[in-house]
Regions:
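C-terminal structural segment of proteins
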Residues: 1-219, 224
Length: 224
């Protein structure tokens, strides 16, 4: 492996500045938990010359609750979010998905932002995020923008992030009354495997109709 430059900014502005400069010079990767990136580097799939570690950015590790509407920082580890009882009471399906990402040790590092940006069709958190109606806040050289989770991916390993952009946080809407969410996956083995099929639901009890489908990217299927 050739020499890799490691940058650890403390603010979003510092991260964006470093990203802008380094991306012009070569291949740059953002590091949150590193559970996917480090494996990709060791296997030779990814060969960055610069790594920007965003774990020291306070805003990206914050969790807030505004009258039932939650904002979760992109670098919040799954194990940390799992300890938020109020969030779990509102969005148990999201936590069900996070608890399926690797071992307890992996969950201590793996983040929502990393699982989303890895853009794997087998990513457990993504269907649950889509079903919840969550949006993602993105920041880059051109400013800030918000995007529905279902619009984030364009294919396996590919996202709608523009050059120099990073994911800042996830915004969850206030849960509707008489609603519930859940996540379930099918795997070849009993433990520690990636999903062959993952399904998330967010149901408001009104009508009794169901629609199903499978797609190479995550798909939202409203019912009537």
């Amino acid at each position: 492996m050739s020499e890799v430059k490691f940058i650890s900014p403390e603010t979003i502005e510092q991260a964006l500045d470093a990203y802008s400069k380094s991306s012009k010079e070569g291949k740059t990767k953002i590091l949150a938990g590193g559970t996917d990136l480090l494996v990709q580097i060791r296997s030779g799939i990814s060969q960055p010359d610069t790594i920007i570690d965003i774990k020291n950015i306070k805003e990206l590790k914050e969790i807030s609750n505004d009258n039932g509407s939650y904002t979760i920082g992109a670098a919040v580890a799954g194990a940390v979010l799992d300890e938020e009882k109020d969030f779990g009471n509102n969005w148990p399906g999201v936590l069900e998905a996070l608890r399926l990402i690797g071992s307890e040790q992996i969950q201590g590092r793996a983040s929502l932002g990393g699982n989303l940006c890895n853009a794997s069709p087998a990513g457990d958190s993504v269907p649950a995020l889509i079903a919840s109606g969550a949006t993602v806040k993105i920041q880059g050289p051109e400013g800030e923008r918000n995007m529905p989770i279902e619009s984030f991916h364009v294919g396996p390993g590919k996202t709608n992030l523009k050059n120099g952009e990073i994911v800042v946080n996830f915004q969850f809407p206030k849960k509707q009354k008489h609603s519930g969410d859940a996540y379930l996956r099918m795997i070849p083995r009993t433990e520690m495997d990636i999903a062959v099929v993952g399904c998330a639901v967010n149901v408001t009890i009104e009508n009794d109709k169901c629609v199903d489908a499978v797609s190479y990217t995550h798909l939202t299927l409203p019912t009537r």
